[in-house]
Swiss-Prot record:
GO terms for molecular function: serine-type endopeptidase inhibitor activity. It is found in: Secreted. This is Kunitz-type serine protease inhibitor kunitoxin-Tel1. Its main location: secreted. It comes from the Eukaryota. The modification Pyrrolidone carboxylic acid is found at residue 25. Belongs to the venom Kunitz-type family. Keywords: Disulfide bond, Protease inhibitor, Pyrrolidone carboxylic acid, Secreted, Serine protease inhibitor, Signal. SMART domains: KU.
C-alpha cells in the first residue's frame, strides 16, 4: 500500500474513533442525574447532560447545591458526558 493510502486509512480510522458513540461505562455516573437547579434563586445559564437525547442541554441553575450534572459551558458538558476520553488498554 502506498504512503498516501496509509495516510488515508489512518485518517479514516481516526475519524471513526471520534464518531463512535461513547459507551455508558466511560461516562461518569453523575451524567445520568436529572437537571437540578438547586434551592437558590440566582438565574444562571448552565448545561446538563440529557441521557435520553445524548446531548448537553441548557437549564437555569439557581446558584447553589443541585448535583454534579451541572456545567458552566456546553463544551465542558460535552467533553465530560458525551465524548469523555476513552480509557486505553495497557
Amino acid at each position: 500500500m502506498s504512503s498516501g493510502g496509509l495516510l488515508l486509512l489512518l485518517g479514516l480510522l481516526t475519524l471513526w474513533a471520534e464518531l463512535t458513540p461513547v459507551s455508558g461505562q466511560d461516562r461518569p455516573k453523575y451524567c445520568d442525574l436529572p437537571a437540578d437547579s438547586g434551592p437558590c434563586r440566582a438565574r444562571k445559564r448552565h448545561f446538563y447532560y440529557n441521557s435520553r437525547s445524548n446531548q448537553c442541554e441548557e437549564f437555569t441553575y439557581g446558584g447553589c447545591r443541585g448535583n454534579e450534572n451541572n456545567f458552566e459551558t456546553k463544551d465542558k458538558c460535552h467533553y465530560t458526558c458525551v465524548a469523555p476520553p476513552r480509557r486505553r488498554p495497557l
